[in-house]
């Protein structure tokens, strides 16, 4: 064997060694970034120039392929941190930061939230969903609880509690809708007798004010969809998380609670389930790191 051949093989072997070392280092760095949400915070705090949606999704996708459980738990921790610790819904909006993460300038795009969009009212009350939102008269909302457990993509649960302060019938349009509800009993006969004795006077003045509890529960999809590598899309900068959603509502207002029990239309909002949904988790993770 001549010297040229020996050198050639030696160089080739060195190249493969270096390439393998580089891949290993890259993989280790990626694992370090997503091993936990706190490690992601630490990494991007020291490497601000690397923090952009495309790069972040690429890193998370790479690590999901090698360690799905750690990656998903890191994503869920970021979701929790932005809502519960950074008080994304309660605090005044930082327009620049918010639009950078969510691509919009409205908190209606935060999931979950108590709004026409966040409550999927159009699916329950087609044609009058905006009026229903006005009936609730949301004055403020605050995330007070966030728990999650992820065993696998076929077994998980995320539960988020939002407390809100509202004012029933906060404008003329919603007052008209309340009259409509009170004019129809649970059988649709046009009598108030089935409304538990509730009348418009029960929502006048300070009696219109109430506290509400909204529980949002996300579980594995019942339609067979599962979180997979292709849900991480660097091009669009999204991480679409498939899940079924249940929204449960209770309030401090005795008469409103009565209506949710006795009136068919009002009662529809009390406990609703939605299948076939997907939720983009990237904005929360990104927002928390900005």
UniProtKB/Swiss-Prot annotation:
Instruction: Cite the residue spans of the region called Disordered.
Output: 183-203
In this record, residues modified by a lipid of the kind N-palmitoyl cysteine are 26
Single GO cellular component annotation?
plasma membrane
Q: Which residues form the signal peptide?
A: 1-25
Q: Where is the composition biased (Low complexity)?
A: 186-197
What keywords would UniProt list here? Cell membrane, Lipoprotein, Membrane, Palmitate, Signal
Coarsely, its chief localization is membrane
List the Pfam families hit by this protein, alphabetically.
Lipoprotein_3 (PF00938)
Q: Where in the cell is it found?
A: Cell membrane
For whether the record's keyword set contains Signal, the answer is yes
User: Lipidated positions for S-diacylglycerol cysteine?
Assistant: 26
Give the InterPro entries listed for this entry: Lipoprotein_3
Regarding protein family, the annotation reads: Belongs to the MG439/MG440 family.
- Name the chain's protein: Uncharacterized lipoprotein MG439 homolog 1
**Organism per entry:** Mycoplasma pneumoniae (strain ATCC 29342 / M129 / Subtype 1)
For this protein's source organism, the top of the classification is: Bacteria, Bacillati, Mycoplasmatota, Mycoplasmoidales, Mycoplasmoidaceae
């Amino acid at each position: 064997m001549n010297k040229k051949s020996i050198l050639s093989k030696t160089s080739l072997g060195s190249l493969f060694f270096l390439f393998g070392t580089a891949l290993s280092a890259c993989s280790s760095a990626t694992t370090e970034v997503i091993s936990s949400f706190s490690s992601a915070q630490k990494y991007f705090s020291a490497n601000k120039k690397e923090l952009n949606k495309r790069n972040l999704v690429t890193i998370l996708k790479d690590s999901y392929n090698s360690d799905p459980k750690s990656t998903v738990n890191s994503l869920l921790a970021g979701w929790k941190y932005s809502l519960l610790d950074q008080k994304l819904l309660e605090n005044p909006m930082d327009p620049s930061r918010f639009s950078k993460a969510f691509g919009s300038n409205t908190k209606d795009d935060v999931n979950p939230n108590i709004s026409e969009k966040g409550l999927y009212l159009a699916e329950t009350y087609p044609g009058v969903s905006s009026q229903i939102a006005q009936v609730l008269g949301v004055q403020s909302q605050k995330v007070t609880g966030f728990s999650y457990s992820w065993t696998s993509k076929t077994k998980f649960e995320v539960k988020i509690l939002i407390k809100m302060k509202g004012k029933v019938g906060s404008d003329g349009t919603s007052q008209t809708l309340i009259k409509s509800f009170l004019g129809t009993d649970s059988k649709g006969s046009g009598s108030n007798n089935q409304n538990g004795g509730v009348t418009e006077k029960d929502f006048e003045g300070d009696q219109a004010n109430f506290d509400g509890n909204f529980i949002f529960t996300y579980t594995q999809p019942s339609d067979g969809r599962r979180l997979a590598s292709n849900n991480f899309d660097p091009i669009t900068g999204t991480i679409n998380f498939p899940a079924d959603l249940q929204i449960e509502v209770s309030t401090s207002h005795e008469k409103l609670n009565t209506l949710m029990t006795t009136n068919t239309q009002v009662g529809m909002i009390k406990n609703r389930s939605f299948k076939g949904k997907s939720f983009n988790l990237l904005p929360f993770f990104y927002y928390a790191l900005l």
